[in-house]
């Protein structure tokens, strides 16, 4: 099951992401090293030498790493059944990053370090900034 946030603009290969998912045979999150000023605005992960996420904190005040998680996920079909448990525990149904944070404490979740860009364009200001970036690149 592929989940993509509708307010993201990305230029990396979903095919490569899917190939990685098949290789690790586990749920996956797109991750990448991010700039310090972006850390408080996104989920931050810690991964082991096999890219398995062992800590995932959504929008931390004191980030433990510079690896940010983006709202691009692939879940195993069996994992989708755990959404019921997640919601029964009273977790936020409107914060998609909280589910993989919860999930990585229950089963293997892997970080796919992607090449390319992924922008959150969920606010008018963010959308305008990305429009300007693309305008400059085309000149």
Where is each model-derived feature located?
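Conserved beta-loop-beta/alpha segment of the NTase-like Rossmann-fold superfamily
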Residues: 1-48, 84
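Catalytic-core segments of class I nucleotidyltransferases/pyrophosphorylases
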Residues: 2, 18-22, 52-139
């Amino acid at each position: 099951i592929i989940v993509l946030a509708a307010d993201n603009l990305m230029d990396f290969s979903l095919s490569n992401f899917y190939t990685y998912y098949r290789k690790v045979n586990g749920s996956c999150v797109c991750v990448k090293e991010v700039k310090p000023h972006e850390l408080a605005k996104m989920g931050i992960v810690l991964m082991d030498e096999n890219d398995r996420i062992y800590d995932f904190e959504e929008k931390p005040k004191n980030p433990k790493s510079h690896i940010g998680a983006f709202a691009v996920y692939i879940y195993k079909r069996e994992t989708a059944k755990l959404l019921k448990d997640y919601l029964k525990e009273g977790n936020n149904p409107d914060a998609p990053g909280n589910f993989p944070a919860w999930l990585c404490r229950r089963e293997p979740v892997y970080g796919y370090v992607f090449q390319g860009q992924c922008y959150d364009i969920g606010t008018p200001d963010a959308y305008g900034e990305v429009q300007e970036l693309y305008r400059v690149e085309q000149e």
